[in-house]
Structure formats: C-alpha cells, structure tokens
Amino acid sequence: MSLWKKTVYRSLCLALALLVAVTVFQRSLTPGQFLQEPPPPTLEPQKAQKPNGQLVNPNNFWKNPKDVAAPTPMASQGPQAWDVTTTNCSANINLTHQPWFQVLEPQFRQFLFYRHCRYFPMLLNHPEKCRGDVYLLVVVKSVITQHDRREAIRQTWGRERQSAGGGRGAVRTLFLLGTASKQEERTHYQQLLAYEDRLYGDILQWGFLDTFFNLTLKEIHFLKWLDIYCPHVPFIFKGDDDVFVNPTNLLEFLADRQPQENLFVGDVLQHARPIRRKDNKYYIPGALYGKASYPPYAGGGGFLMAGSLARRLHHACDTLELYPIDDVFLGMCLEVLGVQPTAHEGFKTFGISRNRNSRMNKEPCFFRAMLVVHKLLPPELLAMWGLVHSNLTCSRKLQVL
C-alpha cells in the first residue's frame, strides 16, 4: 500500500473513532445536561374515582370496577404540579334509563350526569404563596362576580402578615374561584379577574362553572392543590367571602395547638337531617341520599383545620362520590378518616344571635370576642371592622377562646 493511501486510511479511521466517541459522550448525558433545560413532564390523563377508591376511566364510572394494579412508590408520592390540562368528560347517559333518575329535578339530573368529572385545569395559580415559612393559610371561597367582597376582605381580615407572632411564620391569603356561570358574561369577567390577579396575585381559579352544586368541586380542588404545593403549612382557615373573621383570636386559639393534631374546628352540626322540602336551597331528594341524618360537619362560614389533616382529607375525599352540599361532603370525608369535628362557641354560622333582628348581631363588643361570624356584606364588614378596631370600651369581656 502506498504512503498516500496509508495516510488517507489512517485519517478515515481517526475520524470514525472520533465520531463514535462523541456519540457515546452525548448518550451518557441526560437531556437536561445536554440541552441546559429539563425535559417537559409527562402528563397522565386525569381519572375519576369510585367510592371504593379504585381508579377508573370516567366513561366507565357506573360500570363494575376492574382490578387495578398497585401504584408504584413514585406514583404514590403524588404529582409535583397540577396535572390536569384538558377537560374531556362526557355525560353519563346510562342514567337516563333509570326510573329513579327520570323523576329527579333538572338540577340534580345535571349534577349526576357529570358527577364523575372530578378535576379540571387550573386557569390561575400561585404556588409561591406557600414558599418560605407559612404558619396559617387563609383560604376564601368566592365567585368571579363578587370583586367587592374580595376587596373588603383584603382591607380587613384577609390582610397578609409577615409573622403570626410568637416566632411563628407568615399568614397568607388566597381566593378560590371557578368561571362565570353565565356564558354571555364569561369573557368580560375573566378579563376583569385577570387584571385583579395581576394587582394582588392571590387568586386560584379552575375551569369549572361557579354554581351552588360546584362548591364541592371547589373543596376537592383546593385539597388537591394543597397536597401538591403546600405540603408543610401547619394550619388552614377556610371561609366564605361573606363572613367576619377576627385574625387575632384565630392566632391566639392556634397558639397552643400542634399541626399534627386532628384539628377541625367550627360551628359543628350534629345529627342534621337532609332537607326534603323542594323549595329549600338545601333540598336533597331521597334518591341522592337515603340516610336519616348526616355525619357531623362544620356549618357555613368557616373552619380551622390542621395542615396534616387537610392532606389526609384530600385522599379520603377521593374515595367518595361527590355530594352537592360542600359542608356535608367534608363531614363525609372526615367520617372516612374517623375524625370528629370539634364545636367552638367562637364560630357563629347564623350570626351571634339566630334572631336576625337582635341588637347583638350589630354589637361590636361581641364581634371583638368571636373568631368567625356569618354573614356580613362588604359595607357591613368594613363598618364592623372599623368599630372593633377603634378605641372601643366594652362593659365586660366575653371568654370564648
């Protein structure tokens, strides 16, 4: 072989060896190292759950459950981000053949048609709310059209604090919303909400309609969100947007409590019966709930719970079919865990006095002693807040803590 041919041959071999070495080196790197950015996460389609806790396809919700393989240890840790990105859930038309279903009122038929649609995409999210040392997360159920209520809360009891006092962490506030229930209003209110969220950065919103029966969706969406983004927050206060809250009393009450406790405190209703009168807002037909009474549950307005219990509550709720009354549904979830909610005199679901005309319902000295009072509209809330935090002299101090 001539010298020229030998030189060309050696050059080709060297180039081939270099190419193989570069290929091996590239394959040894992870995509994130090579591209300087992590690969996008693989999103699994969201599934609904039957009462026994087995995962099933939403379209097979009413069919017999099939055996499900045990989740891997990695899957049991739960998602690291909100993992529902699309809404693809059709009505369960199999119900139309059931005689008991055919006699139900339209709103209950609509609820049952889509009861298996459990989770929806997030439209507005603020995972940063739980970064750092957060002691108390204040969460308020609101409706997209009720900006005035959210604004009044931000100016009063929903004002955030850098410290809860006594070496405790921050107090942060979030509002929970769906979308406008009237289609013709949806675009307009969504634009206003986007501007509001740019101003305050305190709104969690999901892609379901804000209706009375969908308040239960708001409960389970928040619990799932909490499980993902707030794994270490010690305590949560959850309330409506028409209540008066005394944050000082809430924090004083929590001072001696431990986050590991089964703490669930509010105005607890025992042995409450389902309402069968069709003209009542809380009417429930026997076909939907046939028992004589509900499990104990905290009535409307607000309640306090430990963060560790809230995360267990998320998984307990996922073993039950949805129920159209959100407070009762949470009571059912607590029953699954074997946890009894605790009654406290500082939580007033029906005002300080059940007699709406009573002067007690407008007496600031009573409000100063309470934790939560339901219900007040924005002008009443602002006025009462000003009175409670004025140089008020009360003849005697109520002891409710």
UniProtKB/Swiss-Prot annotation:
Q: Where is this region: Disordered?
A: 35-62
Q: Which Pfam families match?
A: Galactosyl_T
Q: Which domain of life is it from?
A: Eukaryota
Q: How does it sit in the membrane?
A: Single-pass type II membrane protein
Localization annotation: Golgi apparatus membrane
What family name appears in the similarity comment? Belongs to the glycosyltransferase 31 family.
Q: What exactly does this protein do? A: N-acetyl glucosamine (GlcNAc) transferase that catalyzes the transfer of GlcNAc via a beta1->3 linkage from UDP-GlcNAc to the non-reducing terminal galactose (Gal) in the linearly growing chain of N- and O-linked keratan sulfate proteoglycans. Cooperates with B4GALT4 galactosyltransferase and CHST6 and CHST1 sulfotransferases to construct and elongate mono- and disulfated disaccharide units [->3Galbeta1->4(6-sulfoGlcNAcbeta)1->] and [->3(6-sulfoGalbeta)1->4(6-sulfoGlcNAcbeta)1->] within keratan sulfate polymer.
Q: What is this protein called?
A: UDP-GlcNAc:betaGal beta-1,3-N-acetylglucosaminyltransferase 7
